[in-house]
């Protein structure tokens, strides 16, 4: 979480409020899609794995993992495809930010990668082994910070050099650097968002390396459940968890749908007030871009700092749930 904050705060210095608005718009769509497709996978896999091990059915735990990989890989691929297909429509007509489309497309691959990684993550956590998850989380955070900041800085730095040399930027000549900077912000934001997909891939690679080091020993002749039975159980148990995660993520999605529109209406209704109080920002990004600037400042900076402390509370689940599930399976309850 600290590395994540180190990523977003300097990123805000590069992209500014406007660029962070593009960045946050991509996350605004990604969060509910992730909630539906992948958010509940670690919890369900953790619980089922712990129960199978407690019941002395390691073979069934391994088969559940294999079935879950096939099922959720397909669901993740569908989620990635839908995000990519509807990215332009979402950016233009729902988020009212057409410039965010490249960033939305860049985050699409993360959906499928997260689904696969979540299965392996939950499987190991169900064996009360959180080291693979911790190593993957660190790999994700570090790679996201390095790749994201490098991409964003690289785009801005190259555009500045081309402007100073009098060269075209994105196929167009600009007489003023502020206009050139505004033009390359969507590309810089997309580069920063692409780091999310790259970081998820790095986390998955870390999990796969850890996965080879610890495998359950399956006794010969162990009876396992049918694949169809396991699939039904996975779907049945993930629905309430995914629904809960979706409700929590809907708050940020509702913000995405309403905050920018409300600010745009407010600027149009009383432009004199906003020019008087935010004249410098309007001079930089225009009256139409003020709403996106404010939204980016709210989600990209303020909420990043605010969420640091609450995020630690959710970590207790990682150690508590496998033990609770195993005790429940053994009927070892007071």
What is each model feature region?
Residues 114-137:
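Membrane-interface junctions at transmembrane-helix termini in multi-pass inner-membrane proteins
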Residues 85, 96-120:
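Alpha-helical transmembrane segments of multi-pass membrane proteins
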Residues 163-193, 205-248:
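Interhelical loop/hinge segments that connect adjacent transmembrane helices in multipass membrane
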Residues 1-43, 80, 240, 244-258:
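Signature of the first transmembrane helix
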Residues 39-54, 306, 310-330:
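Helix-loop junctions and terminal segments of transmembrane helices
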Residues 11-32, 99, 182-190, 229-237, ...:
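Interfacial/gating helices of multi-pass transporter permease domains
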Residues 78-102, 158:
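Short membrane-interface helical motifs at transmembrane helix boundaries
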Residues 135-184:
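Alpha-helical transmembrane segments of multi-pass membrane transporters
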């Amino acid at each position: 979480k600290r590395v994540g904050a180190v990523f977003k705060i300097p990123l805000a210095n590069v992209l500014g409020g406007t660029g962070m608005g593009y960045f946050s718009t991509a996350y605004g769509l990604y969060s509910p899609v992730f909630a539906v497709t992948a958010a509940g996978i670690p919890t369900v896999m953790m619980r089922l794995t712990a129960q199978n091990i407690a019941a002395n059915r390691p073979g069934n735990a391994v088969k559940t993992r294999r079935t879950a990989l096939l099922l959720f890989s397909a669901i993740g691929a569908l989620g990635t495809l839908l995000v990519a297909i509807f990215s332009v429509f979402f950016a233009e007509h729902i988020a009212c930010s057409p410039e965010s489309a490249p960033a939305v497309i860049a985050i699409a691959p993360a959906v499928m990668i997260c689904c696969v990684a979540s299965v392996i993550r939950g499987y190991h956590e169900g064996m009360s082994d959180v080291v693979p998850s911790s190593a993957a989380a660190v790999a994700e955070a570090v790679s996201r910070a390095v790749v994201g900041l490098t991409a964003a800085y690289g785009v801005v730095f190259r555009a500045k050099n081309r402007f100073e040399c009098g060269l075209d930027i994105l196929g167009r000549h600009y007489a003023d650097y502020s206009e050139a900077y505004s033009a390359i912000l969507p590309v810089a934001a997309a580069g920063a968002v692409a780091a999310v997909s790259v970081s998820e891939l790095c986390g998955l690679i870390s999990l796969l390396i850890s996965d080879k080091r610890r495998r359950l020993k399956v006794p010969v002749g162990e009876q396992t459940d049918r694949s169809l039975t396991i699939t039904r159980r996975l779907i049945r148990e993930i629905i309430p968890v995914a629904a809960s995660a979706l409700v929590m993520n809907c708050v940020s999605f509702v913000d995405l749908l309403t905050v920018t529109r409300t600010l745009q209406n407010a600027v149009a209704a009383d432009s004199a007030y906003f020019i008087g109080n935010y004249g410098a920002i309007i001079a930089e990004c225009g009256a139409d871009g003020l709403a996106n600037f404010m939204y980016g400042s709210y989600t990209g900076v303020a909420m990043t700092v605010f969420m640091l402390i609450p995020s630690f509370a959710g970590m207790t689940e990682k150690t508590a749930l496998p033990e609770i599930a195993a005790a429940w399976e053994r009927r070892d309850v007071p």
